[in-house]
């Protein structure tokens, strides 16, 4: 006898947190509820951008739009935004979030800043 397949229960999550982690090579977007449970996530690499195309603002915009669509299916409308990292996708991802129709309540910059910790990598000579 075959095992009965469980139906996926549709969650109703009205508020959440959007984490935008933007590095020089990629942009990763994670959307969670207020408790920190991940609702959806996406990155530029998952969408098929490879190599230097992952670090473009356009790739970050598409990554956020994809993650936001999945979160909107769960009923999410109001979000807080936490942005981390110095990458080129920061502002593009924020603009994409506003255009998807989410109500943004707060924007935090949580980029870690060292209090003179580790020595940074040496300058590139090309």
UniProtKB/Swiss-Prot annotation:
Pfam families: Ribosomal_S11 (PF00411). This is Small ribosomal subunit protein uS11. Located on the platform of the 30S subunit, it bridges several disparate RNA helices of the 16S rRNA. Forms part of the Shine-Dalgarno cleft in the 70S ribosome. GO terms for biological process: translation. Part of the 30S ribosomal subunit. Interacts with proteins S7 and S18. Binds to IF-3. GO terms for molecular function: rRNA binding; structural constituent of ribosome. Keywords: Ribonucleoprotein, Ribosomal protein, RNA-binding, rRNA-binding. The keyword Transmembrane helix does not apply. Gene3D superfamilies: Ribosomal protein S11 (3.30.420.80). It comes from the Bacteria. GO terms for cellular component: ribonucleoprotein complex; ribosome. Belongs to the universal ribosomal protein uS11 family.
């Amino acid at each position: 006898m075959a095992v009965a397949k469980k139906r996926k229960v549709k969650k109703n999550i009205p508020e959440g947190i959007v984490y935008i982690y933007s590095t020089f090579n990629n942009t990763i977007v994670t959307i969670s509820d207020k408790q920190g449970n991940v609702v959806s996530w996406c990155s530029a690499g998952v969408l098929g951008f490879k190599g230097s195309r992952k670090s473009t603002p356009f790739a970050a915009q598409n990554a956020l739009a994809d993650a936001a669509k999945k979160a909107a299916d769960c009923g999410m409308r109001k979000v807080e935004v936490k942005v981390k990292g110095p990458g080129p996708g920061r502002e593009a991802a924020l603009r994409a979030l506003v255009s998807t129709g989410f109500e943004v309540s707060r924007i935090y910059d949580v980029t870690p800043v060292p209090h003179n910790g580790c020595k940074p990598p040496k300058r590139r000579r090309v």
